[in-house]
Amino acid sequence: RRQRQMCIRDSLTPLEGLVMGTRCGDIDASVVFHLMRQGGYTVDEMDTMFNRESGVKAMIGSSDMRDLDDLMAAHDPVGQRCWDVYVHRVKRYLGAYMAELGGLDVIVFTAGIGEKSPEMRFSCLEGLEELGIEVDEKANNHRMSTPTIISTPTSKVTVMVVPTNEELAISRHALQFAK
């Protein structure tokens, strides 16, 4: 908002939000009670299930998004379902953020699948042209080693891919503590 980064996440744990490699993302809270009653799970087992055994791993048997890419290339229906769930959640959050902020200036894809899967980026943004998001397919399909804009020149929302440099980020944080 007003050219400032915003994070709207205010949950207790990292479970809220998107489906992740091993985390479930948003779920109906009653699922917890149902599983404990019907499945006999303990609190610790539920914690392990939601944090380490859910998400993409529960859907395809692996938390590695490259395995999801392989399943998609093989036209596997289980892979397609996982892909659809992931894309649906991303689009739902984009819409929610746009509503809360009154629009978006920039969407940034980074790390893992955001950085390395042009197909996933395209799927997440496909059909959002009415919201001012237009992807340049040629730019999206290039391998990026520097921050790259992948939206069209006429897109109202700038879409970027920013390669992750975790070592640099860690070094910068460490320097702050060293001062």
Pin down the residues of each PLM region.
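Short, small-residue-biased leader/transition segments that mark boundaries at the very start
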Residues: R2-I8
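A conserved active-site cap/scaffold subdomain adjacent to cofactor or substrate pockets
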Residues: R9-N51
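Hydrophobic alpha-helical scaffolding
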Residues: G21-G25, M36, A58, W83, ...
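Short gly/pro-enriched beta-turn/loop segments at secondary-structure junctions
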Residues: I27, N51, S63, G102-L104
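A general structural signal for well-ordered alpha-helical segments in protein cores
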Residues: A29-V32, M65, R121, S171
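A mobile "lid/hinge" subdomain adjacent to the ATP/sugar-phosphate binding pocket shared
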Residues: G39-C82
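Internal helix-turn-beta structural module
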Residues: Q80-L104, V108, G114-K179
